[in-house]
Amino acid sequence: MHDVIKKLTPEQALEVVMRLSEEGGAIRNAVVAEARNVLSGIDLDQIANEVFFVLDSVDVRDCWDRAGSSRDGYTSPDEAAVELVEEQLRPFFDQAGRYHDLGMADEEATYCQGVILGIYRYEHESKSEFREWAVDIPIECAGALLTDWRERGQDSISAAAMEEFIRDRCCPHWARYFFRMGRPT
């Protein structure tokens, strides 16, 4: 029986989980509990590594391909770079929002910290050619995530913990910018 489960495609596995959760009762409760366990297993450094990897994988040629004239007007290389970075970060920003929607405030904060750390590492460690075209984009994106997080109504303890994380562990070079701009305190 375990072999059957391991052979399911991701779509088939999702279908099984959905059918089980529709059964209700103890089965649904078990599925929901396990889903929360999976979502609670956040590794801040793993998230940071994933963010760094997706940003560091952007090819400068993709930026050049997007830049230039089109039916919709002209796109500068800088605008194309912003679009590319935002596209890569969108799934991470969306996941942070899902944590909020589920009422998982601690997980949301930890996840945001991992994303911010990954963005910071990208700005300071990446050797990619694209990074040269992405000047100021990382700090702006991290600031946008912090603003979104803050606007979702964080308490003062969470805000203080986020500020401490940014100042002491993550990105001391960015702290002045974030806190001068009113983020996230």
Predicted regions and their residues:
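Eukaryote-biased, non-catalytic alpha-solenoid scaffold regions
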Residues: 2-3, 22, 26-185
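Eukaryotic low-complexity, mixed-charge intrinsically disordered interaction/regulatory segments enriched
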Residues: 1-19, 32
